[in-house]
Amino acid sequence: ATFFLLSWTHCWSLPLPYGDDDDDDLSEEDLEFAEHYLKSYYHPVTLAGILKKSTVTSTVDRLREMQSFFGLDVTGKLDDPTLDIMRKPRCGVPDVGVYNVFPRTLKWSQTNLTYRIVNYTPDISHSEVEKAFRKAFKVWSDVTPLNFTRIHDGTADIMISFGTKEHGDFYPFDGPSGLLAHAFPPGPNLGGDAHFDDDETWTSSSKGYNLFIVAAHELGHSLGLDHSKDPGALMFPIYTYTGKSHFMLPDDDVQGIQSLYGPGDEDPNPKHPKTPEKCDPALSLDAITSLRGETMIFKDRFFWRLHPQQVEPELFLTKSFWPELPNHVDAAYEHPSRDLMFIFRGRKFWALNGYDIMEGYPRKISDLGFPKEVKRLSAAVHFEDTGKTLFFSGNHVWSYDDANQTMDKDYPRLIEEEFPGIGDKVDAVYEKNGYIYFFNGPIQFEYSIWSNRIVRVMPTNSLLWC
């Protein structure tokens, strides 16, 4: 591992390919950045590899592995979606390849482990730092037989420190953003140690980088876990702020850590969140909307992003794009002429322009004219040609007039009367090419606006190419 840093500019024989449509958009800086990223996180060249004369993985192979890891279209070309992922702040541990200077073991042989906070970041108080690490260790001790004890001097199993740039382990940090932290797997010397880049702004909130979230991830590495391909997992390599509410370790991480250490005596949170499977025959959806030519499909803490030119839908945590939004979405719709997407949860709604929440939001749904009895919406769809927006709640539908900014008279109406045959509730809805697509559990109805009737009934998951 010592010498993979020496190879940045010398061990590459193949140029990095890029998408044909992106020729004019990619700068030399983009290409250099992408090569550095791939060398760092996909089969980094190590001293052991050099001594053994191991075959150097080509740039294209690394790029394909990276695209596969993140669920992107595996094109072997450097396109915009690939660069977008590369630019996100992340853990410094490779996704594919060895990250260690000394021999590693798969797990700790003992269940009673010690940790020591060697130094502190100036960004938050000492007590906040200590609380963040205490909570982070508890994430793992809650689901395993592991016990963690803090010591204040001497050498602990897990030594925790903050540093900048080159900080003594041959894996230098890179300044603000980019690489946030790294940790070593169980083993002697550096084994188990976790290092945090003090050029980042560490916080106890959604601002900067939340120390608890990053610490919990890094300690997963300290205990023997590699990165997960599951975008909902704590061990997914990209940083995402998960919200103020009580953190629950996702099921993927529970399965991983218990495969090493077994379960604990009593799990305080037996229901761990799972990542939705797009081809689940029982799949139901929370909300659907278009956004600048793409389709956004919300389910639990996630959304799938469907691009017309891409085969595979991409799955993301909602908070990875909009940290200030709630984890779950009730309804959503796009207003193309205003370049806005509206998101609803409970009695609140947000207006978004791309990644940005508009000033003055969230607002209350009562501002739109809903009575206080309406506590949440189940679906919404906007019609650009008429300026009308339909809102669904319970077994009723409302019609909102954009021009007058009021609800239309004679509403609400019963869903079954307004759209015969689709049932008395709607989970999600969107409009395309003169058809309205209503989703109710695992079934979707294609409804013709012109003939006022259902023309097709399909599985919900067919929207995701299943």
UniProtKB/Swiss-Prot annotation:
A GO cellular-component term linked to this record: extracellular matrix
PROSITE patterns recorded: CYSTEINE_SWITCH, HEMOPEXIN, HEMOPEXIN_2, ZINC_PROTEASE
GO molecular function: calcium ion binding; calcium-dependent protein binding; collagen binding; endopeptidase activity; fibronectin binding; low-density lipoprotein particle receptor binding; metalloendopeptidase activity; peptidase activity
UniProt binding sites for Ca(2+) 1: D123, D198, E200
Listed Pfam families: Hemopexin, Peptidase_M10, PG_binding_1
Residue positions binding Ca(2+) 2: D157, N189, G191, D193
Motif Cysteine switch: positions: 89-96
Cofactor: Ca(2+); Zn(2+)
Species this protein is from: Rattus norvegicus (Rat)
Entry protein name: Collagenase 3
Primary site of residence: secreted
Region (Interaction with TIMP2): 171-241
Binding site for Zn(2+) 2: C91, H217, H221, H227, M235
Top-level EC class: hydrolase
Modified residues (Phosphotyrosine): Y361
